[in-house]
Amino acid sequence: MTVYLTAEQVLFIHYRLVSETGGEHGVRDIGLLESAIARPRATFDRHDLYPSNFEKAAALMESLVNNHPFVDGNKRTGIACTVLFLMQNGVTFSATNPELETFTLRVASSKIKHPQIVKWLENHSRF
């Protein structure tokens, strides 16, 4: 069974990251935040739109990074929540901090799409 992040967890992660690394606190659009958190759970006709946990993680990251629900720290929050989501679901992440930074910037610039995000997450994970 998949363990999903709650809004409270995402808000806490965002608060801690901005407090520790700088930037402005705050939610810019609560609807975008709720949408980003809900996206990994999306279904159609009772079938998951994102069947694997890597697909769910990619959906979460893509939404948090690109929808800009926060005033600041969207990329930091997006990658941190993605890693936490995978860890909560039994995956060990093996990417280095420089790799995470480069990857997150590529996601933010829309240079890679959902299938490539999934593949990157799979290639940088261990079970």
Task: Give the ranges of each region predicted by the language model.
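FIC/Doc superfamily catalytic core
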Residues: 1-127
